[in-house]
């Protein structure tokens, strides 16, 4: 410390003799200066004086050299100082001891100096003192050059980065990772993710627009415009429907205002009923004209939008046999009724409990026809086994439990005789039992509503057929015969470690008892067309009987007016058999999708002892819920085939005309015999000795005389000579007037009798003319 204060005290004395000294500058050592610094430590440098013009003093912290200098920052005295190693501390203090004579720098320069201090790495600051040990005091660089150096360094760094990027791009190009864009007029920028999404949305809109153009008008689901927007009705008819709807609304508003219930008058004309609008039973005007409308229940399903008809045997039991016949006629005609587009109003008609009078089908056939061959499926396999119906019934009894049995299904057998590879036989007694029902009597393939006129029931190509299904169920693998789900043993230990028996090996299998969507058809090739179907359901009981009927089938039926759209959406192949027309199973998700597109459907549950009727163009799918034996057949209704009905009527007319012709031939033969008998009578008058009592005997029994004449074989006599004979006889025999009057009266009576009873108009006219001519000639001759 004493040395420090002595140096400070000696400083003013030296000021007068020596010129002002610049402050020491701490320089960042470059690798070239490191050697010089090491040599300077060994050999201390001496003070070197140079001219003012040679070197320019470097400013540090915005300050110049001595305090007496009045020039700019670049014109101060350029003097470099060096100190020995021992006097470093004193020199540093001396260099910092002249703050009073320095000029105040500007504010931006102070900011620059602060930034420079922060960037320095070589030197350190302790309590405001700069360490300069072992470092020579070289001239400091100006701030402008420092800024320029910094800019150059930044530029160099940027260039290095660019070079690195270029090298990386070249490497990627060589590896093929970067695709080169061809420069030219057709150069397009790469699309962004947003542009791609916009393009996808535009494509979807175009597709929807095209689908909308395929349909003439998009289907609307509003209650008020649903019928109009379907595109199936003309504008004139739409206006009529609007007017009818307005009248209906006014009518029902009036009914709501009245408290008394009045009877609705029966309408002569049945109005058009549109099922596209949700309606209730009492709103359907077509039911008002029916005699048994209180026994018909119409169900409109809000989810699917389609309607169906129900009738219950418990309510029909009160009817007499004659009334039952009339009710069956009304019910069948209502189920198969269609609009002007040939689309049925209802998707199905069901008579619940109408087959209770029939015996259990399996029991009946296994007891009465035990050796009848049938084809039986095997669970879990596609193989088919041929066995007898009694053996099949025994397997059903052995595996039956609570509505299902665990055996294969029985394939269809024909009940009207087997043809080619078919299985079945002709069972006339069973068919007679079916015909006892008034509903089935009308709707069998040869029924009263059918357009077919079969000579024998064996000629039917439309059924009936019978089959048995076990019901959809989950079956354990242990109960499956020769289970196909066996684990494949592998020698790989890694796979064995990943083996999870619960996940990889199924312990039970789903047995799907389903018939995919299809439509009933008749004919082949270009003559193939849709038709109606009728079915009878009898549940398999096997001694277990319940009071309430069991659900046997879950059915989905699509509206007949949406037939073409359903075929397009479900990709139906209508030329395939019913089991393979559709590839996919229509579940709830698919139904909701179809409903959003305007397609109507109905979900139906069929019970034991039900008889159901399905109109044409109704696509339907079945799922067997419990074990059931089914009967089904196709019916060609007269309303579906008006041409065949017309041909049948013409055939009937031809038969009646042929019958009339045979009768006319018989009458003509009788007439010829009668005419010959009259001529013989005239010829007999040639004899003048003939007695009148004989003529009176013929007059009293005219029919007997004609029969006697008909039985006698007389020679053929031409009319010309007989007329000559009559002339001669009547010219000779003119005196007997009473005999002449009696003959005229007998001829008139006989001619009137034949004209009224036996002879056709054409024939009678010819014979009447000849006889009248004879009579007139006789009168004139007299």
From Swiss-Prot:
Subcellular location: Nucleus
A GO CC term attached to the entry: nucleus
Keyword flag Cell wall biogenesis/degradation: no
Keyword tRNA processing attributed: no
Enzyme Commission number: 1.14.11.-
Keywords: Dioxygenase, Iron, Metal-binding, Nucleus, Oxidoreductase
Details of cofactor binding: Binds 1 Fe(2+) ion per subunit.
GO molecular function, one term: metal ion binding
InterPro entries: RSBN1/Dpy-21
Residue spans of biased composition, Gly residues class: 62-74
Main location, first listed in the record: nucleus
Binding residues for 2-oxoglutarate: 515, 612
Compositional bias of kind Low complexity: 30-42
Obligatory cofactor(s): Fe(2+)
Compositionally biased intervals (Basic and acidic residues): 14-26, 101-113, 149-160, 167-177, 185-198, 657-669
PANTHER family: LYSINE-SPECIFIC DEMETHYLASE RSBN1L, ROUND SPERMATID BASIC PROTEIN 1
Name of the molecule in the record: Lysine-specific demethylase RSBN1L
């Amino acid at each position: 410390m004493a040395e420090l204060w002595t140096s400070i005290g000696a400083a003013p004395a030296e000021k007068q003799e020596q010129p002002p000294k610049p402050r020491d500058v701490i320089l960042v050592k470059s690798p070239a200066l490191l050697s010089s610094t090491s040599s300077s430590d060994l050999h201390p440098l001496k003070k070197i004086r140079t001219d003012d013009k040679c070197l320019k003093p470097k400013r540090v912290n915005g300050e110049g050299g001595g305090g007496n200098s009045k020039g700019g920052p670049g014109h101060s005295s350029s003097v470099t100082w060096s100190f020995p190693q021992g006097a470093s501390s004193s020199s540093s203090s001396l260099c910092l001891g002249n703050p009073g004579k320095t000029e105040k720098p500007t504010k931006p320069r102070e900011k620059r100096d602060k930034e420079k201090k922060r960037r320095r790495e070589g030197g350190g600051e302790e309590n405001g003192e700069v360490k300069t040990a072992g470092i020579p005091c070289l001239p400091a660089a100006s701030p402008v050059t420092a800024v320029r150096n910094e800019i150059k360094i930044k530029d160099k760094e940027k260039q290095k980065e660019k070079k690195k990027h270029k090298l990386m791009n070249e490497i990627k190009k060589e590896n093929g990772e970067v695709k080169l864009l061809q420069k030219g007029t057709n150069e397009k920028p790469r699309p962004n993710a947003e542009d791609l999404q916009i393009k996808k949305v535009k494509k979807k809109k175009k597709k929807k627009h095209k689908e909308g153009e395929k349909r003439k008008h998009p289907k609307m689901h509003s209650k008020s415009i649903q019928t109009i927007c379907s595109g199936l009705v003309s504008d004139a008819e739409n206006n009529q429907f609007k007017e009818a709807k307005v009248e209906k609304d006014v009518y029902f508003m009036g009914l709501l205002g009245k408290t008394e219930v009045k009877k609705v008058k029966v309408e002569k004309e049945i109005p058009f009923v549109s099922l596209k609008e949700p309606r209730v039973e009492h709103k359907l005007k077509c039911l008002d004209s029916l005699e048994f409308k209180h026994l018909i229940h119409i169900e409109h399903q809000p989810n699917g939008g389609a309607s169906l008809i129900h009738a219950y045997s418990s309510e029909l039991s009160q009817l007499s046999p004659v009334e039952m016949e009339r009710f069956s006629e009304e019910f069948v005609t209502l189920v198969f009724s269609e609009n002007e587009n040939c689309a049925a109003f209802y998707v199905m008609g069901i008579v619940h409990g109408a087959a209770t009078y029939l015996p259990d089908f399996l029991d009946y056939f296994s007891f009465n026809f035990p050796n009848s061959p049938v084809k039986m499926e095997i669970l879990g396999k596609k193989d088919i086994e041929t066995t007898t119906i009694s053996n099949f019934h025994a397997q059903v009894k052995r595996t039956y439990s609570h509505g299902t049995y665990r055996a294969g299904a029985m394939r269809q057998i024909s009940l009207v005789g087997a043809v080619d590879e078919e299985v079945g036989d002709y069972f006339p007694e069973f068919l007679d039992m079916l015909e006892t029902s008034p509903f089935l009597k009308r709707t069998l393939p040869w029924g009263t509503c059918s357009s077919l006129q079969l000579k024998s029931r064996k000629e039917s190509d439309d059924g009936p057929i019978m089959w048995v299904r076990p019901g959809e169920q989950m079956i354990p693998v242990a109960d499956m015969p020769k289970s196909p789900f066996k684990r494949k043993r592998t020698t790989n230990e890694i796979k064995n470690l990943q083996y999870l028996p619960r996940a990889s090996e199924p312990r039970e299998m789903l047995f799907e008892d389903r018939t995919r969507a299809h439509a009933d058809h008749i004919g082949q090739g270009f003559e193939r067309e849709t038709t109606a179907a009728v079915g009878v359901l009898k549940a398999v009981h096997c001694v277990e009987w319940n009071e309430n009927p069991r659900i046997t089938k879950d059915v989905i039926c699509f509206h007949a007016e949406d037939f073409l759209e359903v075929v397009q959406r479900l990709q139906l192949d209508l030329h395939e058999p019913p089991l393979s027309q559709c590839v996919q199973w229509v579940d709830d998700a698919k139904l909701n999708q179809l409903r959003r597109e305007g397609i109507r459907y109905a979900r139906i549950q069929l019970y034991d002892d039900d008889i159901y009727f399905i109109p044409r163009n109704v696509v339907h799918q079945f799922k067997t819920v419990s074990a059931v034996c089914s009967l089904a057949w196709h019916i060609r209704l007269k309303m579906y085939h008006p041409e065949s009905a017309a041909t049948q009527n013409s055939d009937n007319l031809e038969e009646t005309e042929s019958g009339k012709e045979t009768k006319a031939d018989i009458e003509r033969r009788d007439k010829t015999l009668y005419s010959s008998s009259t001529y013989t009578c005239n010829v007999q008058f040639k004899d003048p000795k003939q007695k009148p009592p004989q003529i009176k005997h013929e007059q009293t029994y005219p029919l007997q005389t004609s029969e006697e004449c008909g039985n006698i074989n007389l020679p053929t006599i031409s009319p010309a000579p007989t007329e000559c004979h009559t002339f001669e006889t009547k010219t000779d025999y003119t005196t007997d007037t009473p005999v002449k009057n009696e003959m005229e009266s007998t001829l008139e009576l006989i001619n009137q009798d034949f004209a009224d009873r036996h002879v056709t108009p054409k024939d009678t006219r010819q014979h009447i003319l000849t006889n009248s001519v004879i009579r007139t000639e006789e009168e004139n001759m007299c």
